[in-house]
Amino acid sequence: MEIAQALILGIVQGLTEWLPISSSGHLVLLQIILLSRSSAAFIALVHAGTLLAVIVAFRRDVFNVIKSFLEGISELPKGSAFSSPERKLPLYILIGTVPVAVLGLALAKYVDEIFGSSKIVGVGLLITAALLYSTKWAGGERPLDLRRALIVGLAQSIAIFPGISRSGATISTALLSGLKREEAIRYSFLLSIPALTGFLILELIVSPAHEILNPEGLVGLLSSFITGLIAIKFLLSIIRRGRLHLFSYYCVIVGIAILSLL
């Protein structure tokens, strides 16, 4: 892989991981167009860049979640460990992560078939479009609870399939479940951290060290980190203005084009 290709793939990963248009789908398409399949190590590094982006963007929330979890653990003997909403959030994140972990392990041996199909990408983008468009009618003031945490976690699990946007699926589902807009945003982004961390660890385990420590990988990591931060800031402004559905038009156009041409 050349530096220019690494830069392009890193930028695409950074933008599409957080914009609700499916990073996996766009990476699959780019690899088809460039006739170059990225190594597991490179994929891991660009995901590391987007993971760092969300941790930096939500650093206060990440700190508070860790703090609440540790405080809850320390008060287990008292019987009031996870009674407050702040203390419950770490548990909701763990519970919401279970579906994607289970489905990911179940589909592990089918990775090549799933990620080698442009038709799956096209269908996935149309599903993403439907979810995003439906948010035109979403709205609520309900707090996060166990049921909604699990529902959003299930939505995250289907984003394993290329073409289905993780951020699009989780934020749309959270809004449709009646969650307050800010709570839907916060939970969706915090929920992504364990999933991305798990994926990153699995990819690094099977990656030779020499494939990780190279200029192309560093370019991919830095470009995905920088563009990831930009994408998160842009997406937050769109959601807060109630215009998440606008991304559905792009997903429909690209999804139909893929199914028609590839």
Curated annotation (Swiss-Prot):
Q: Where in the cell is it found?
A: Cell membrane
- Provide the topology term for how it sits in the membrane: Multi-pass membrane protein
Q: Where are the membrane-spanning stretches?
A: 15-35, 38-58, 91-111, 114-134, 149-169, 189-209, 219-239, 242-262
Q: Does the keyword Hydrolase apply?
A: yes
Which GO terms are recorded in the biological process aspect for this UniProt protein? peptidoglycan metabolic process
* Reactions listed under catalytic activity: di-trans,octa-cis-undecaprenyl diphosphate + H2O = di-trans,octa-cis-undecaprenyl phosphate + phosphate + H(+)
Query: Keywords assigned by UniProt?
Result: Cell membrane, Hydrolase, Membrane, Transmembrane, Transmembrane helix
Q: What class of enzyme is it?
A: hydrolase
Its Gene Ontology cellular component terms are:
plasma membrane
Coiled-coil zones: none
Select a single GO molecular function from the record's annotations and give it: undecaprenyl-diphosphatase activity
Among PANTHER family, the record links this protein to: UNDECAPRENYL-DIPHOSPHATASE (PTHR30622:SF2)
Q: What is this protein called?
A: Undecaprenyl-diphosphatase
Q: Which organism is it from?
A: Korarchaeum cryptofilum (strain OPF8)
Organism classification: Archaea, Thermoproteota, Candidatus Korarchaeia, Candidatus Korarchaeales, Candidatus Korarchaeaceae
Q: Which gene encodes it?
A: uppP
